[in-house]
Amino acid sequence: MSKRDYYEVLGVARTANDEELKKAYRRCAMKFHPDRNPGDAAAEASFKECKEAYEVLSDGNKRRMYDSHGHAAFEHGMGGGGGPGGPDMNDIFGDIFGNIFGGAGGGGPRQARRGADIGYVMELDLEEAVRGVERRIEIPTLAECGDCDGSGSEDGKVETCNVCHGRGQVRIQRGIFAMQQACHNCGGRGQIIAKPCKTCHGNGRVEEDKVLSVKVPAGVDTGDRIRLSGEGEAGPAGTPPGDLYVEVRVREHAIFQRDGDDLHCEVPIRISQAALGDTVRVATLGGEAEIRIPAETQTGKLFRLRGKGVRSVRSRSEGDLYCRVVVETPVNLTNDQRKLLEQFEATFNGEDARKHSPKSATFIDGVKGFWDRMTS
């Protein structure tokens, strides 16, 4: 029977990146894992197919070979058949199949397994990220079966597999090639459970919603990860559990924009404040602070408040707060206010206007020069 396309096996596009491949492989492996499907030959075959596909597509060189030549890239004769200048096909098969089934191509001992790592995304408000917070989270996971203490055996007894003799692998000879593959008798575990636990059906693990308390340190930012060692899935047959990785995502804030340990905000001021100068109050993480606005301040001027940013989670130094002034045009004017502004505008005439609005005058001169050059 011809092999299925590796991308089809994992259910991803041919343009899938490393993260998409990893997620697809995890879904596939969880669905067909022998520990979850004891005695199911079809599931075991699908599991091996998933691992083989991921082994090739997750390796840059093998993926390029596969994209160029398909499955033929790993068949006898491709690349010179192991002769000078070409890859040793026995090494290629040993690399692929050995890594897939937990051993080296030379038939080394079965590697110890552990539980899978779990990822969790925690969304925080800026205030929580800056000050730190303790959160209770609930995650679905595979926990050690309490009835058999994770052994999978009702009476706690296991027997050494009489096919692989405890190695979990068998050596298959196909022509001139020797390959390692998981033992069909024990599913790669190296042991046989005579009396499977009725609760976990010999798996040693049960599905469970675990509740944990996670302490988030002050100063974290989007993309930071917190590792909780041993809080991942329980390992099969009493092997060590995996880890839990909590990834932080900080929500957008109504006032502040964060850039590392610095904060940025906009401070609206009136035309009169910008022209005459004033003192305005601004919000900071620690309360209010004052900024002195000098006379003739223009939109876009930055004011720096040292140490009013975020305390770094790594160095414990503090960032700064940058306040950008925005001169706000007044709206909803009363008749008296409109008349005053009209009187004020009437004072700008001729060369006198250039003195009071230098940027506007420079812009007008630039436009005039442009049209003079265009029409000359």
UniProtKB/Swiss-Prot annotation:
Domain of life: Bacteria
InterPro entries: DnaJ, DnaJ_C, DnaJ_domain, HSP40/DnaJ_pept-bd, HSP_DnaJ_Cys-rich_dom, HSP_DnaJ_Cys-rich_dom_sf, J_dom_sf
Residues given in the record as Zn(2+) 1 binding sites: 145, 148, 197, 200
Keywords associated with the record: Chaperone, Cytoplasm, DNA replication, Metal-binding, Repeat, Stress response, Zinc, Zinc-finger
Keyword Zinc-finger: yes
A GO MF label: heat shock protein binding
Coiled-coil residues: none
Pfam families in the cross-refs: DnaJ, DnaJ_C, DnaJ_CXXCXGXG
Signal peptide location: none
Binding residue positions for Zn(2+) 2: 161, 164, 183, 186
GO cellular component: cytoplasm
Annotated cofactor note: Binds 2 Zn(2+) ions per monomer.
NCBIfam families listed in its UniProt record: DnaJ_bact, PRK10767.1
Domain free text: The J domain is necessary and sufficient to stimulate DnaK ATPase activity. Zinc center 1 plays an important role in the autonomous, DnaK-independent chaperone activity of DnaJ. Zinc center 2 is essential for interaction with DnaK and for DnaJ activity.
Subunit description: Homodimer.
The protein's name in its UniProt record: Chaperone protein DnaJ
Higher taxonomy: Bacteria, Pseudomonadati, Pseudomonadota, Gammaproteobacteria, Lysobacterales
Gene name, Swiss-Prot/TrEMBL: dnaJ
